[in-house]
Amino acid sequence: MKHIFLKSWAVLAMIALTIGCTKDFDEINTNPNAPTAVSSALLLPQIQRDMMNTVMNEAWGIGNIVIQHTAKNQFVNEDRYLWGEINGIWNSVFDNMRDVKIILQQSEANGQNNYKAVALIMKSWMFSLATDAYGDVPYSDATSAKEGENYPKYDTQEDIYNGILADLKTASDLLGTSSEAIAGDVIFKGNVTQWKKLANSLRVRALMRISKKRDVSADLRAIIDSPANFPVFESNADNAVYTYASTSPDQFPLHTARIGSFNEFRASKTLLDTLQTLNDPRMPVFFRPTPDTENSANPVYVGIPNGLNDVDALQYNGGPQFQSRIGTIYFEQAISTQGLAIAKGFMMTYAELQFLLAEAAEKGLVSGDAKTYYENGVNASFEFYQLDTPTDYFLLPEVAYAGTQAEKLQKIGFQKWISLFYQGMEAWFDWRRTGIPALVPGASNQNNDMIPVRFRYPLIEQALNGASYKAAVDRQGPDDLNSKMWYLK
């Protein structure tokens, strides 16, 4: 009996000791090397890099082709509009939005208005990519699984753009109202003024994107007529771009591509012939002479028509040795001094803004001289590629800012199309609105002679979020490549 009594006391003592120890269990068992919270300074650069890489990869694989900047001579499904799932933008936007949401929550809790503003700008740009690519997408319910929203509704594109414009305005107003440095920023290195310029420049882009659906003149004028309150890009120094490194693992995405994969992509005849007609010095930056003439005294440039079948594309003009490849600045020379200055990740540039303002001024939506904006855009594009604008360039009939309003708008759109070469998906997004230049689907296209205007929704959405997916399709139109989204209707 005494033995049992002693054992019972021992058990009780052990229980008491265990209970006492558990009071500090969380503190004792917290790994100091595994943080439970990640700072905005660590989250921000990863968001920026991942989004830039996604956009540049999608542009290389599909965006440059559909806008007829490049063409393919092998594995030509993309060029013939045989598009399957294209989920890069979708996945990257919604994956990274979780971290953007964390930055928003942390910045609000800590009174960090600069970080909040940057997060709102990133959110706005990211959702603009998603809705520009697919149309209606989850927006107000996105990244709300922790709050119990496992089946987010698809917001209308109109509501998304209203939200984007509101967030960009809020961001512009917030920037500079707190003192914290924007540590971790790999786009503007924490420059608050440049972030403010980006917010307002993106507002101009967004307003012009929806300008066929409502009168945007008052909103545009409120920005352009008040530079002290709403500054915009003033030069190429303000370009919202990501500069890659010369060393791994942060090199330009194509620098480490297999040479065979890189060389499947060739100059599009549409763009190359245009550059040759204009004797445009950007041509040898964008493209290389044919391999057969590359090292000769008389280099020859030849582009491939878009939309050829595999046999015709590979054999065009006598074969790959007689077809121009993409410039080395986007491949092996991407880590050179010149390559680092040109082969970047793109959000928006000063040249694009000037072309948007030229269009707006020509249409009477803003004050200012359309010709000046137009020529600023052309000059900025040449300057970005470290080139001087040819002295007679603005005297060329195809370039000179003269003619009817329709002819002037054609020239604005045409030069913007050239300037947006491999600058993300913007050339395609913008072309769908303007129709400039007048592109023709390739002879062997598989899309009923129509150039696609959107991506299909990811198949997983039909399986996991079927009701929301169906509501979006019923509202927007069939889930195919040709259904026009709200601002295109």
Where are each of the predicted segments found?
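Structured, solvent-exposed acidic/aromatic patches
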Residues: V38-S40, Q68-M122, M126-F384, A402-L409
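Long, intrinsically disordered, low-complexity segments
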Residues: C21, P253-T277, M283, F287, ...
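Substrate-binding clefts and substrate-entry loops adjacent to catalytic sites
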Residues: N150-Y151, D388-P397
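Membrane-proximal, proline-rich intrinsically disordered regions
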Residues: C21-N77, L82-G84, N91-F94, I102, ...
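Bacterial Sec-dependent N-terminal signal peptides
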Residues: M1-T30
